[in-house]
Amino acid sequence: MKNINLKIADITQEDVCAVVNAANSSLLGGGGVDGAIHRAGGEQILSECKKLRTSLYPNGLPTGEAVATTAGEMRAKYVIHTVGPVYSSCKNRCEELLANCYINSLKTASELKCHSISFPAISTGIYGYPKYEAAQVAYKSVKSFLETDESMEINFVFSSKESYDIFADAIKEL
């Protein structure tokens, strides 16, 4: 699909309107993509996340929801934080929760008047979601969104060739 791109790159260096952070529910940073985005964006991201925790999400951001902050010192304008499902504990709701991450991130980007967004492979790291299945959920979700908003340019950004190849193979099957 013309609006969907796959690439191997550093997501913190993306020159897009919004970068999606595969966050943990605390919104306070962590490992993997979450830690990299917090480090690259600097104190502004953490400061806004702390405000969100005290105002809107005292118990943390729920799985599948999305919320935006500044991107701080990164090239992007916004970071959209979303919490993916932990595969071992999401039971029969894994696909729905992961799809919600993508759909709600895209809705948030659209509300912010963004026309470009970069996603990591949400939940495929420490959260253990099988990459091939996650790729199919991601692709179906963004494809569905593009049926209502053709103006969005969507990037899937991977830190490894292995992840890139798995996602590329998975979406060929759809």
Regions found by a protein language model. Name each.
Residues 1-174:
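Macrodomain-like recognition of ADP-ribose-binding/processing modules
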